[in-house]
Amino acid sequence: MKYIGAHVSASGGVEFAPVNAHEIGANAFALFTKNQRQWVSKPLKEENIRLFKENCTKYNFQTDYILPHDSYLINLGHPEEEGLEKSRAAFLDEMQRCEQLGLKLLNFHPGSHLNKISIEDCLALIAESINLTLEKTKGVTAVIENTAGQGSNLGSEFWQLRYIIDRVNDKSRVGICLDTCHTYTAGYDIVNDYDKVFDEFEKEVGFEYLRGMHLNDSKKELGSHVDRHDNIGQGLIGSAFFERLMKDSRFDNMPLILETPDESKWAEEIAWLRSVE
């Protein structure tokens, strides 16, 4: 079974995210548990936590299919000590918020070397950051998102994702989220080489680590390393790819999350994706 949703607003409180997801016909969703553009946010209140859990139960959202995203400011591979410590503290806070909400997954972009350290050194720092956070928390899996490889962002190549996983001590609490737009613009031709790309993912990383997907079409070309999402069927990936993915059982039983730019089309996109399953 496919679990499809979108990255919905939690404006006014995290408890509104499941309500917003229900309104677009979703059975999965993503959210920010705090302001994603601030380093520090107020702690979650007991009432917000209680209402979030109540609304998830009310609208039949299971925690396996909720994929919170961390702050865009965090860089777990930061080459400078101050930036690294700040990022690690913020990441721990994000993971603890997930614990409080009873969530099992936390999705994040791996990090950037900022042209100051080697790719391998940065990847090792990211793994170390994950290890430190997992040691201080329970029950939440760190879900690394592949990137488009824009600038000095790492995680655009499958071997880099594997490099991090290999250095994480608790393999049961690390996973991958594949973003279709990022995969395409990173240079993997999911349109013309569907089988080849996912065979390569299986060989390099392994489907046992895949914990979710972001379903986005792309405004930018294959291998452009530019991250610009488009609505399903309107970009350069096209609807045929998404139709094939919906029929592929390897993507069952995980959150499939839209981050497409026109939010008014989310209900329509979810309905279409369900219709081609």
Curated annotation (Swiss-Prot):
Catalytic activity of the protein: Endonucleolytic cleavage to 5'-phosphooligonucleotide end-products
Cofactor(s) listed: Zn(2+)
SMART domains: AP2Ec
An example molecular function term from Gene Ontology annotations: phosphoric diester hydrolase activity
Binding-site residues for Zn(2+) 1, renumbered to this chain: 69, 109, 145
One Pfam family this sequence matches: AP_endonuc_2
Keywords: DNA damage, DNA repair, Endonuclease, Hydrolase, Metal-binding, Nuclease, Zinc
Chain positions recorded as Zn(2+) 2 binding sites: 145, 179, 214, 259
The UniProt record lists the keyword DNA-binding: no
Positions contributing to Zn(2+) 3 binding: 182, 227, 229
Documented EC number(s): 3.1.21.2
Domain of life the protein comes from: Bacteria
Manner of cofactor binding, per the entry note: Binds 3 Zn(2+) ions.
Keyword Transferase annotated: no
GO BP annotations listed: base-excision repair
PANTHER family attached to this UniProt entry: APURINIC-APYRIMIDINIC ENDONUCLEASE (PTHR21445:SF0), ENDONUCLEASE IV ENDODEOXYRIBONUCLEASE IV (PTHR21445)
Protein's job: Endonuclease IV plays a role in DNA repair. It cleaves phosphodiester bonds at apurinic or apyrimidinic (AP) sites, generating a 3'-hydroxyl group and a 5'-terminal sugar phosphate.
Family affiliation: Belongs to the AP endonuclease 2 family.
Stated name of the protein: Probable endonuclease 4
Record organism: Bacteroides thetaiotaomicron (strain ATCC 29148 / DSM 2079 / JCM 5827 / CCUG 10774 / NCTC 10582 / VPI-5482 / E50)
Recorded name of the encoding gene: nfo
